[in-house]
């Protein structure tokens, strides 16, 4: 198996070769992953918002952004600058502390969740042993911020939006966790790196989507609900409750909610790609590609090329799912709140439990095919 590139080890060794002590080299490395994570997530949001505008324009037979830079690529930057310079209004009868903390509590857990996302064998900020459940734990903090924002606004529509967000998150976190548990059962690990490694070696046929089709659908539906994307955007339904918990917000506080929403969408798409679509794994096994090219899998140049293409493969799979999510937003009608809760509690939860039991039975009956 291609072991990939040890990014941290290579960086520290390079600094030590320059005469920098090991302790200093490690201290220099420590903030770099967080900085790279912030830059990567921000660029990802810019791309996702541009895609949103272009795909929505295509669905409505419009051209979409085209004047701000080539193909309108600078529109997300212009939107961000507009929000930065807008006045930050705090309602007179609101709770200013909770009103300010709400959007911050929403955004921080989403960015922290990128710590466990691997883009390659050793290209991961923190290979935590319980990485997937760390993400679920962090995502459960978000509804607190949304409820806080809705309550602090002193607005009935904001409060309704916050309550809807909390109810929706609780309803779909359990099916999401059950789908993840089935994957962990097959992989014998909760580490995202181990889960991808368990899928590698057989190309597209080894991906978990074939062994867990029901789990894939549960995870994808629950992830869309957690991201509050149509048809599950009940907490901010314009026709019913103006803008939900965002009603009284303006300026960058308003922008933080949208930033959190898009970063969450990208994060969820990355995790679907990692858990079910092989992550950085190629559709064709690497040993076959190396054989066709007449090179060894251990060749350093081949490893660098495959590691680089592996990052591209992970991002491509994720943005393919982002495209599907955006397309769903502009083609599927919104469900009612009772339908939303019924889907979570009365359908996805029992189906997730049955899927988990079925996975356990198949793992016992066919250990080689289901993780050993």
From Swiss-Prot:
Pfam families: NADHdh. It comes from the Bacteria. PROSITE patterns: COMPLEX1_ND1_2. It catalyses: a plastoquinone + NADH + (n+1) H(+)(in) = a plastoquinol + NAD(+) + n H(+)(out); a plastoquinone + NADPH + (n+1) H(+)(in) = a plastoquinol + NADP(+) + n H(+)(out). The keyword Thylakoid applies. GO terms for biological process: aerobic respiration; photosynthesis, light reaction. One of its GO terms (cellular component) is plasma membrane-derived thylakoid membrane. Its main location: membrane. The chain crosses the membrane at residues 27-47, 97-117, 128-148, 166-186, 204-224, 249-269, 308-328, 351-371. It is a multi-pass membrane protein. Keywords: Membrane, NAD, NADP, Plastoquinone, Quinone, Thylakoid, Translocase, Transmembrane, Transmembrane helix. NDH-1 shuttles electrons from an unknown electron donor, via FMN and iron-sulfur (Fe-S) centers, to quinones in the respiratory and/or the photosynthetic chain. The immediate electron acceptor for the enzyme in this species is believed to be plastoquinone. Couples the redox reaction to proton translocation, and thus conserves the redox energy in a proton gradient. NDH-1 is composed of at least 11 different subunits. PANTHER family: NADH DEHYDROGENASE SUBUNIT 1, NADH-UBIQUINONE OXIDOREDUCTASE CHAIN 1. Belongs to the complex I subunit 1 family. This is NAD(P)H-quinone oxidoreductase subunit 1.
